[in-house]
Amino acid sequence: GGGAEKSWKPFKEELFSHMSGRVLFLALGTGLDIPTFPKNKEITAIDISPKMLEVAQSRINAYSGSIKAEVMDVHELTYEDNSFDQVFTSCTFCSVPNPLNGLRSLRRVLKPDGQLFMFEHTGSRYYPFKIMMDLMTQITRKMGPDMNRNTVKHVKDAGFEISEINHLFLDVVKTIKATNPA
């Protein structure tokens, strides 16, 4: 991965170190996060793009555990209700067209008391950054990511109980830990 990926690596490693049980990893992409996964886990990973998963295949093959990669849209998960113990996301919800529905979909497949772990960049309340993020969002929204989403609000509105929020870069980049209430 590039420079930005490297600087977030320790934070991702810490977040992903909590992986246990049946794990769903959302938006695997080209697999840049795989080297930060703990060893010997069984992970189901999805991405909307078959091409991305093709590129990820060498990283999937190199992983010490097992990664079952599937082409799937978070809005249309084909898994049974209560299928997973944990769900992990990494810079995903800036690109999900309907984040609230996506999070509700994740909650459906998460067992009661299951955990959601997120590494996300979100909108800022700090004035200079808020202005910059608003401007960047005007530009990037046309191309894809909306970096200015209120992800914390979406997580709550989807019915999750947030247990922890860690601000890694002001209030723009953060980790969120939440539970699917029983």
Name each region found by the language model.
Residues T175-A182:
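C-terminal lobe and adjacent flexible extensions of AdoMet/dcAdoMet transferase-like proteins
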Residues G2-R22, L32, T36:
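Conserved alpha-helix/loop element of class I SAM-dependent methyltransferases that forms part
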Residues R22-E76:
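Class I SAM-dependent methyltransferase SAM/SAH-binding core
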Residues L100-P112:
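A short glycine-rich, Lys/Arg-flanked "PGG" loop and its adjoining helix->strand segment in the class I
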